[in-house]
Amino acid sequence: MPTNTVRCLRLLPLASVLLAACSVHQPTQTGKSPISPEWQQHQQKVQQLSQYQTRGAFAYISDSKRVSANFFWQDTPPQRYRLLLTNPLGSTELELRAQPDGVQITDNQGKRYVGKDAEYMIQQLTGMAIPLNNLRQWILGIPGDATEFTLDERYLLKTVTYRQGNQNWNVSYQSYNTELTPPLPTSLELVQGEQRIKLKMNNWMVK
């Protein structure tokens, strides 16, 4: 199976993530205070996860296209993760594997692309600029590099506003699985201009 350098392709849009270190923020916020012990304890518990996986539904909506897929995400910090996108029939549309020495993406034709920067690769392959570094943390319900966020009445992340270059990303959380320890999101939405990305996590497995 050939290995190709990254080039522009019409591929299924991908909302994948990269692991990045988390830090305590001094944000602009409303609602529950981000310096509260409850929020600080929650962040610490999330950051202490040694392994997790989740599966669910992914949707990308813009003025020009609508795409949906099932996804499976498996992460073993600090830099090993796998993201698999499949169509409704269960066939692979796109697979991303990341390790400390690089990133490999396989498309639905079996072609492989290798590189070092997953965020750059996804932008080149799909034509979409997605904040992958921060999405890795947003999917877990922590704010990443964002300094503007709000908490709900349970001291869980409710909204995030993040500026990346000339793009403003707004993230909103619709629901959490509070039976998990720590509680983790089950539905969130990212909006940037006319782009809208929806993620629904049907289940989580954490260690």
UniProtKB/Swiss-Prot annotation:
Protein's gene: lolB
Lipid moiety-binding region (S-diacylglycerol cysteine): 22
UniProt subcellular location: Cell outer membrane
Subunit architecture: Monomer.
One GO cellular component term: cell outer membrane
The protein's name in its UniProt record: Outer-membrane lipoprotein LolB
Family: Belongs to the LolB family.
HAMAP family tied to this protein: LolB
GO-annotated biological processes: lipoprotein localization to outer membrane; protein transport
Gene3D superfamilies from the UniProt entry: Lipoprotein localisation LolA/LolB/LppX
Pfam families, alphabetized: LolB
Entry superkingdom: Bacteria
Keyword Membrane carried by entry: yes
Protein's membrane topology: Lipid-anchor
Native species: Pectobacterium carotovorum subsp. carotovorum (strain PC1)
Function: Plays a critical role in the incorporation of lipoproteins in the outer membrane after they are released by the LolA protein.
Signal peptide (residue range): 1-21
Keywords: Cell outer membrane, Chaperone, Lipoprotein, Membrane, Palmitate, Protein transport, Signal, Transport
Residues covalently joined to lipid (N-palmitoyl cysteine): 22
